[in-house]
Amino acid sequence: MLNKRVIPCLDVNNGRVVKGTSFVNLRDAGDPVELAARYYREGADELVFLDISATTEERKTMAEVVEKVSKEVFIPLCVGGGLRSIADMTTLLRAGADKVSVNSAAVSDPDLISRGAEKFGRQCIVVAIDAKREGNSWQVYTHSGKKPTGLDAVEWAMKAEQLGAGEILLTSIDADGKNTGYDNELNREVGSRLNIPVIASGGAGSPEDLYNALDKGQADAVLAASIFHYGRYSIAEVKKYLKSKGLPVRLEN
């Protein structure tokens, strides 16, 4: 069985890491390079950077952040936020990213997934899906969870895989930032229909929440932010807990 991955998420705004609830009420969480280096030392399996300002000016700042981080950190880096073209992807991959994440642009231009996979390999292309529960299903929202698309999240994930996505980064808007656990029904519904890894996101408040997402939610990896940023738990503590519960994880010596 493949190791389950623990992935800190760093939302970057104006060159600083921030954290909010359901994409609003942002507060400062520190310097991206310092935090990335700390998480690398603690045993993170990968890092995800999301540029939540994503103006043209900020994209340059983000590329600079990625370049600095890639000199300090030797685990895979995935970078997303406002990527709209192959040129945007190229900029970040050249700066040192290993993977790029596309969200709103993939919904408006699904062929971007195929073009990215063709140019860089599907292992490089992560499709991020922000989903909100509506009755017995989940709708895809774009533009930082503000814009309903009418797309069913499970169907969109399946289509993204067909188009060439190498992974799905699945965020529950309902759970995001609330620290009360992941939407494991959503994780299971999506994961059971795909042959590519699903990264569960939104809702981590304790090591048990991460365990439940990997076990009950059947996710391949878990993304978490505030649980790590504010020092509530270290990555090493969380991974030791997951190991003690019988999950396969990579532990630092």
UniProtKB/Swiss-Prot annotation:
Pathway: Amino-acid biosynthesis; L-histidine biosynthesis; L-histidine from 5-phospho-alpha-D-ribose 1-diphosphate: step 5/9
Keywords: Amino-acid biosynthesis, Cytoplasm, Histidine biosynthesis, Lyase
Active site: 11, 130
Ligase found in the keyword field: no
One GO term describing the cellular component: cytoplasm
Keyword Repeat appears in the UniProt entry: no
Known EC number: 4.3.2.10
Chief location bin: cytoplasm
Domain of life per record: Bacteria
GO MF: imidazoleglycerol-phosphate synthase activity; lyase activity
Subcellular location: Cytoplasm
Bilayer-spanning residue ranges: none
UniProt-listed CDD domains: HisF
Gene Ontology BP, a term: L-histidine biosynthetic process
Family affiliation: Belongs to the HisA/HisF family.
Protein role: IGPS catalyzes the conversion of PRFAR and glutamine to IGP, AICAR and glutamate. The HisF subunit catalyzes the cyclization activity that produces IGP and AICAR from PRFAR using the ammonia provided by the HisH subunit.
SUBUNIT field: Heterodimer of HisH and HisF.
Alphabetized PANTHER family for the sequence: IMIDAZOLE GLYCEROL PHOSPHATE SYNTHASE HISHF, IMIDAZOLE GLYCEROL PHOSPHATE SYNTHASE SUBUNIT HISF/H IGP SYNTHASE SUBUNIT HISF/H
Descriptive protein name: Imidazole glycerol phosphate synthase subunit HisF
Organism in which the protein naturally occurs: Dehalococcoides mccartyi (strain CBDB1)
Gene name of the encoded protein: hisF
